[in-house]
């Protein structure tokens, strides 16, 4: 049985001298010298804009990189196998030049914002205003924003969200409401859900960040910036365009239920 393969020609002017070097390529397969010389391979698509290649990296498929060549008679010579093994990782690099996403990167109070999975962008929200609630009881704090419905979306919208912040040690960590959701009831929420507003059926995200807002208001957390990202971000390609703080009809908002002590 022949398994699915991706065959990529190597440049002869670079590889022929190497293949003939017995200090690198010995007669033994899986030469240790070869593995020391060749640390790995980088695959890039051409053209590099709007291109993606998909590889099955499950443990149920044979995952090997093999370098082989033929002699003058056409016979395949010794192949040198690289077993990818059970631990794998992927890195995605995005070029946002001349894109709607690139136009709003680093901007505040925009009409639209973007959340992507994989190596895509997150949404940053500044909660500095809640520091004025120092002497106020915060009963509930919810961040609400609506999804822009695309006519012909390339990928599905993000199904669920997580919220993180940079702590005093400089480490990105889940807010308390997120970590509580991991151990018991779903405190955070963050799933995409339908709602009717003014006769229109819309889809929105609602994040209960009450505990985190209280900690900022008390001064127990100094950094007021939170990062909203796709839940299980590395697992599948998703993207959501959401209505931002400056959207004229359905702006992003922080809903607070408070009382005086």
How should each PLM-predicted stretch be described?
Residues 1-261:
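Secreted, disulfide-rich extracellular signaling modules
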């Amino acid at each position: 049985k022949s398994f699915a393969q991706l065959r990529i020609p190597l440049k002869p002017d670079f590889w022929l001298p190497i293949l003939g070097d017995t200090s690198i390529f010995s007669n033994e397969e899986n030469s240790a010298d070869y593995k020391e010389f060749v640390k790995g391979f980088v695959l890039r698509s051409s053209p590099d804009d709007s291109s993606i290649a998909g590889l099955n990296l499950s443990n149920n498929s044979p995952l090997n990189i093999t370098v082989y060549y033929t002699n003058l008679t056409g016979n395949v010579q010794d192949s040198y196998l690289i077993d990818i093994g059970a631990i794998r990782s992927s890195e995605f690099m995005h070029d946002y030049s001349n894109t709607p996403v690139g136009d709003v990167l680093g901007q505040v109070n925009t009409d639209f914002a973007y959340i992507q999975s994989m190596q895509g962008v997150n949404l940053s929200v500044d909660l500095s205003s809640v520091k004025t609630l120092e002497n106020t009881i915060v009963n509930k704090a919810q961040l609400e924003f609506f999804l822009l419905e695309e006519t012909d979306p390339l990928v599905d919208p993000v199904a669920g969200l997580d919220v993180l912040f940079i702590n005093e040690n400089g480490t990105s960590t889940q807010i308390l409401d997120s970590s509580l959701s991991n151990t018991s009831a779903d405190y955070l929420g963050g799933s995409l859900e339908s709602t009717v507003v003014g006769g229109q059926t819309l889809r929105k995200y609602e994040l209960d960040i009450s505990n985190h807002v209280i900690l900022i208001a008390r001064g127990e957390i100094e950094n007021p910036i939170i990062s909203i990202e796709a839940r299980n971000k590395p697992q599948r390609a998703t993207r959501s365009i959401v209505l931002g703080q400056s959207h004229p009809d359905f702006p992003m908002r922080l809903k607070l239920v408070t009382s005086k002590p």
